[in-house]
Amino acid sequence: MSEEKKSVELSGDIDFIETPPAKASQFETGEDCGIEVTKAAAIPNPPLAVDGPGNESFSNYLLGGTLVGLPAFLTWFFGGGAKTFVFFFLLSVLPVLVAFWTYASTFSPRTNEKVKLPGRPVEHYITFKREEDKAKWHGKNKIPMQTFAEMYLDGLVDFNGDTLDVMEYRHDWANFSFTWDLFKFIVGTFFVDVLFHTKAQDEEQVRPNYDSGNDHYAWFLGPRMIYTSGIISDPEKEETLEEMQDNKMAIVCEKIGLKEGETMLDIGCGWGTLARFASLNYGAKVTGLTIAENQTAWGNDALRKAGIPEEQSKILCMDYRDAPRTKFDKITQLEMGEHVGIRRLTGFFRQCYDMLKDDGAMYVQLSGLRQAWQYEDFIWGLYLNKYIFRGADASTPLWYYVKCLEQAGFEVKGIDTVGVHYSGTLWRWYRNWVGNVEAIKAKYGPRWYRIWELFLAWSVIASRQGSATCYQMVVVKNLNSTHRINGVASQFGLAGALAASRAAGKSRLP
């Protein structure tokens, strides 16, 4: 083994912890919050499920009228013509957008007033380090969430308790106004990333993220090393993270009707756990693709340790655009499409179409955003784009994914929405991360720890409340010759797919 490979942490180099138990809340009032509160064991139940301001009060007509009306007025005032209008329009479009979104996000009312906020002062939840910040945000004067996030990463403010617990009460101490720093990131970084998504750009942005260290990911993903949503099988039971991930892999294999000896391509395979599961439990011949060298080393090492020969299954370090141009019985891609980019999504699906046998099936799992957005959704999403998933921009409402798949030549066979399952998964990731706090800070520093701590805690909430969700889609080629009747037996929802895998004794990774 080369010296370079020796420096990569493999499964035997990691001491995995058992997911710590959830902490009791310090902030519960015991009073009626105005709506029913759930008591499921599978997720952290929200104490204040507040519907914040968003598209319910946002007027596209008013925005459009302002964008056109201001340059029209200036053109009339100065006695100009069409060229003058174009000049003033180009001059004013960005300031108008910034001013409009700032005003709307600051002064729009909540979508509804059902939830009663405790009304505690800001300092009950968070503690500022600088006197000027204490003077600026105190009592009922709430801090913009984006400003708070940046200050928290810089160590200028602390939570007065467990991060997730305090974030559950964020509507009592923060607002969701768009800030100048947020606009600078959108214009100067986010839009630039969205425009291109070249291979070189993706390697520059994606590879350092997933090659940041296998130990970094192991500290929250646990022994399965799966960076996608698990599945809850029983809301009244707190399944382990490993059980939830096994549930998901079993469902994937059943939904595509995977059979022994079939070839399967897993695009964006991560650390290769699905490839190992499908190889061991279903006898498939799997090729996994990842752009990350550390993931490739881990995945192949785990396959060999499980007794799976390279002739059967392997992980390749390769950009999806360089995928082997051969035909596969089944294709899977779990939450890698976000890195493809909105502009390239249909072309990517068409590439998959060309690599899939005519009677094959493809499983697509993608994160999504709701059409009925709230301002918090954008602020959370841009935090993720800046610090966690740089360049990942293809999280959209469901209709856009369906359109891209159909334009690529596919027919949608089935769809499940699993956002709340993601919340349960993230809850366990968050507890793992907090449980490894000392090791993380010792190697990566306190800022790195805080970036991911806030991401995981906030995402637990975002996926539970609908800010973000996740879709499982199974598609087949939309050809007259596609034997659709053969797919009826595998046309499962979540419960049916998992039951079929359990009945066959294939639902747990050995």
Swiss-Prot record:
One molecular function GO term is: methyltransferase activity
Q: Which Pfam families match?
A: CMAS
Say yes or no: keyword Lipid biosynthesis present. yes
Q: Tell me the membrane topology, using the record's own terms.
A: Multi-pass membrane protein
Intracellular or extracellular location(s): Membrane
Carbohydrate-modified residues are: 55, 175, 294
Enumerate the UniProt keywords alphabetically: Glycoprotein, Lipid biosynthesis, Lipid metabolism, Membrane, Methyltransferase, S-adenosyl-L-methionine, Sphingolipid metabolism, Transferase, Transmembrane, Transmembrane helix
Transmembrane feature ranges: 62-82, 84-104
Gene deletion effect: Leads to increased resistance to cell-wall-damaging agents, such as calcofluor white (CFW) and Congo red (CR). Accumulates unmethylated glucosylceramides.
GO CC annotation terms, alphabetical: membrane
* Pathway info: Lipid metabolism; sphingolipid metabolism
Q: What is its main location?
A: membrane
Amino acids binding S-adenosyl-L-methionine? 227-228, 264-272, 290-295, 320-321
InterPro entries per the UniProt record, alphabetical? SAM-dependent_MTases_sf (IPR029063), Sphingo_C9-MT (IPR052290)
- Give the GO terms filed under biological process for this record: glucosylceramide biosynthetic process; methylation
Q: What is its EC number?
A: 2.1.1.317
Top-level taxon in the UniProt lineage: Eukaryota
Biological role: Catalyzes methylation of the sphingoid base component of glucosylceramides (GluCers) at the C9-position. Sphingolipid C9-methylation requires 4,8-desaturated ceramides as substrates. Glucosylceramides play important roles in growth, differentiation and pathogenicity. The methyl group at the C9-position distinguishes fungal glucosylceramides from those of plants and animals and may thus play a role in host-pathogen interactions enabling the host to recognize the fungal attack and initiate specific defense responses.
The keyword Electron transport is annotated on this UniProt entry:
no
- Enzyme type, top EC level: transferase
List the protein's name: Sphingolipid C9-methyltransferase B
Give the species: Emericella nidulans (strain FGSC A4 / ATCC 38163 / CBS 112.46 / NRRL 194 / M139) (Aspergillus nidulans)
